[in-house]
């Protein structure tokens, strides 16, 4: 019988080249910067860019909106829904 040395999977991963398959550039917040649009509940065209086709608010990890601006955006969308400018659900 021959002795085999067993390498744990984590060590094997680093030994076999643990390069990342691709580099994804971090997106910047669309509401930061000098020419950034203001978040306003009356701007339905801007708010609808951050809604899914079902009418749900798209999470910030997909839209790259900062946490502070995501809260403002959610509040503006909810206010626009209440004022009947945006639908709650899309049928």
From Swiss-Prot:
Coiled coil (UniProt feature): none
Keyword Isomerase found: no
Pfam families noted in UniProt: Ribosomal_S18
Recorded superkingdom: Bacteria
GO cellular component, one term: cytosolic small ribosomal subunit
GO molecular function: small ribosomal subunit rRNA binding; structural constituent of ribosome
UniProt GO BP: translation
InterPro entries the UniProt entry points to: Ribosomal_bS18, Ribosomal_bS18_CS, Ribosomal_bS18_sf
Swiss-Prot/TrEMBL keywords: Ribonucleoprotein, Ribosomal protein, RNA-binding, rRNA-binding
PANTHER family in the cross-refs: 30S RIBOSOMAL PROTEIN S18 (PTHR13479), SMALL RIBOSOMAL SUBUNIT PROTEIN BS18M (PTHR13479:SF40)
Family affiliation: Belongs to the bacterial ribosomal protein bS18 family.
Role according to the record: Binds as a heterodimer with protein bS6 to the central domain of the 16S rRNA, where it helps stabilize the platform of the 30S subunit.
Cross-referenced NCBIfam families: S18 (TIGR00165)
Summary of subunit composition and partner proteins: Part of the 30S ribosomal subunit. Forms a tight heterodimer with protein bS6.
Protein name: Small ribosomal subunit protein bS18
């Amino acid at each position: 019988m021959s002795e085999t040395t067993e390498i744990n999977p984590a060590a094997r991963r680093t030994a076999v080249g643990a390069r990342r398959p691709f580099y994804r550039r971090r997106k910047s917040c669309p509401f930061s910067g000098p020419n950034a649009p203001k978040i306003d509940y009356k701007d339905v065209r801007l708010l609808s860019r951050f809604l899914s086709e079902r009418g749900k608010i798209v999470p910030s990890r997909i839209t790259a909106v900062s946490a502070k601006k995501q809260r403002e955006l959610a509040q503006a969308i909810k206010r626009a829904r209440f004022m009947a400018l945006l639908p709650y659900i899309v049928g």
